[in-house]
């Protein structure tokens, strides 16, 4: 299933400071080097989806402040 890409200017994206490129978040206090969507527990590789944004896909190299390490 193809999900429409999440627009960083969308309200829910802005609420979590989502960016398409993790480098854009380097100055965010919660950001740590190496964190990006494709190594987050909420990322769904088969659809490039995210459990936090169920109606959209996210960039694998993106980031948001809810990033959580995969177990």
UniProtKB/Swiss-Prot annotation:
GO terms for biological process: aerobic electron transport chain. Transmembrane segments: none annotated. The modification Pyrrolidone carboxylic acid is found at residue 1. [4Fe-4S] cluster binds at residues 37, 40, 50, 64. One of its GO terms (molecular function) is 4 iron, 4 sulfur cluster binding. InterPro entries: High_potential_FeS_prot, HIPIP_sf. Keywords: 4Fe-4S, Electron transport, Iron, Iron-sulfur, Metal-binding, Pyrrolidone carboxylic acid, Transport. The keyword 4Fe-4S applies. It comes from the Bacteria. Gene3D superfamilies: High potential iron-sulphur protein (4.10.490.10). SUPFAM superfamilies: HIPIP (high potential iron protein) (SSF57652). It holds the Pfam family HIPIP. Signal peptide: none annotated. Homodimer. Belongs to the high-potential iron-sulfur protein (HiPIP) family. Specific class of high-redox-potential 4Fe-4S ferredoxins. Functions in anaerobic electron transport in most purple and in some other photosynthetic bacteria and in at least one genus (Paracoccus) of halophilic, denitrifying bacteria. This is High-potential iron-sulfur protein. The gene is hip.
């Amino acid at each position: 299933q193809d999900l429409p890409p999440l627009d960083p200017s969308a309200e829910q994206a802005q609420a979590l400071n989502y960016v398409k490129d993790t480098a854009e978040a380097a100055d965010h206090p919660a950001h740590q080097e190496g964190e990006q969507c494709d190594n987050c527990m909420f990322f769904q590789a088969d659809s490039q989806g995210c459990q936090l944004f169920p109606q959209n896909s996210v960039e694998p190299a993106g980031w948001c402040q809810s990033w959580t390490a995969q177990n």
